[in-house]
Amino acid sequence: MAFHNNHFNHFTDQQQHQPPPPPQQQQQQHFQESAPPNWLLRSDNNFLNLHTAASAAATSSDSPSSAAANQWLSRSSSFLQRGNTANNNNNETSGDVIEDVPGGEESMIGEKKEAERWQNARHKAEILSHPLYEQLLSAHVACLRIATPVDQLPRIDAQLAQSQNVVAKYSTLEAAQGLLAGDDKELDHFMTHYVLLLCSFKEQLQQHVRVHAMEAVMACWEIEQSLQSFTGVSPGEGTGATMSEDEDEQVESDAHLFDGSLDGLGFGPLVPTESERSLMERVRQELKHELKQGYKEKIVDIREEILRKRRAGKLPGDTTSVLKSWWQSHSKWPYPTEEDKARLVQETGLQLKQINNWFINQRKRNWHSNPSSSTVSKNKRRSNAGENSGRDR
C-alpha cells in the first residue's frame, strides 16, 4: 500500500470558488489533491485550513481546484514522494493512453478518478484510526504554532476543536467499507518516521526563530540606528519647528532627497513591520518560557523556604493561649520576671528566647491599646529618675 502526498489533506468544505493563487503560491504548491467524494462535501468544518480569509471573500471564481492552493495542512516530505514515483508514472502513462481514446471512453476516465478518490479516502481512514494519529497531529500542529503569527494562534485552537468531526467522517467510511485495523507494517513505519520527521522539523523551526530570525531583526534595527545617527532623523519624527518659506522649501527638498536615497538603497521603512513585531513577540514569549522552565525548580525551592520560615516563626495555638492568659492577668505591668519566664517555659515547652520575643512583639502590638500599662510605665520611669537625681545631690 502506497501513501501519497495528499493523504493528510482531510476532506472538508473546501470546494468554494476561489481566484487563482498568486505566482508565489503556485511555486510553493507542487501537489494538487483531487476533489473529494460528494458525500464528504456537506461539512462546514475547516480543519486546519488556515488560509480562509481570501477564500471566503472570493466566491465568484469558476475554478474549484484552486481551493487546494490555500491549504496549509499536510505537505508530506520528500521521502514519501520517492516511494510513489513508480505509481505516479504508471498513472500518467495510463492517463495518456485513455486520452487518445475517442470521446466515447470519457466515462472510463471518470471511473478511474472516482476509484482514486475512494482509495485516497480509504488510506486516510486507516491513518486516522492508527494509534499514532494523535501524536502525528500534535507534532504537525506544534510546527504550525511556531510558524504562525501570534495573533493567528487562536484560529488553530478553534479548528482543532473540529477535529472530532473529521475523525467521525472517516470512521463512518471505515465502518462502511469494513476496514479493520490489522498489522500493517508499512503504515506503522510511515507513521513512526513521519512523527519523528515533524519533531525534528519543529526543533529546526525553533532554532530559526530564536537565533537566525532574531539576528535578522537585530541587524535591521542596527541599520536603522546607523541611519538615524548619520541623518539625525528618527523613525516617524517630525520637525515641529516654525521656519520661513525659504527654509521650508529647502527642508522639503532635502527630505525628498533623503526619501529617494532610501528607496534607491532598498532599505524600506524604518519602523518595524507587522511580521517583525510578531516575530519579536514570539521570541519574547519563547525566551520567557525558557526562563520559567530553567528557573522553575529554584523558584519553587525559594517559595518553599519562605513558607517554611513563616511556619517556623508561628507558635502553636495552645502555647500562645498560655502566654495570652498571663498577659491579660498582668495587663497593668506586662513584664514577666525571670521566675515568671521560667514557669512559662515549663508550661509551654518553648525556649526562653521565643518567650522573650513573643512578649516584645505583644507589647508592640498593644502599646497604644493599653493606656494603663503605658501610664504605669511612665510613672515608674519618672520615680526612678527622681530617685537617681536625689542620690546625685
From Swiss-Prot:
GO BP: any one term: response to light stimulus
Transmembrane regions: none
InterPro entries xref list: ELK_dom, HD, Homeodomain-like_sf, KN_HD, KNOX1, KNOX2, TALE_homeobox
Keywords of the record: DNA-binding, Homeobox, Nucleus
DNA-binding region range list: 307-370
Region (Disordered): 1-39, 81-114, 363-393
Domain of life of the native organism: Eukaryota
GO cellular component: cytosol; nucleus
Stretches assigned to the ELK domain: 286-306
Subcellular location: Nucleus
MF-aspect GO terms: DNA binding; DNA-binding transcription factor activity
Family (UniProt): Belongs to the TALE/KNOX homeobox family.
Subunit structure and binding partners: May form heterodimeric complex with the TALE/BELL proteins. Interacts with OFP1, OFP2, OFP4 and OFP12. Interacts with KNATM-B.
Protein name as annotated: Homeobox protein knotted-1-like 4
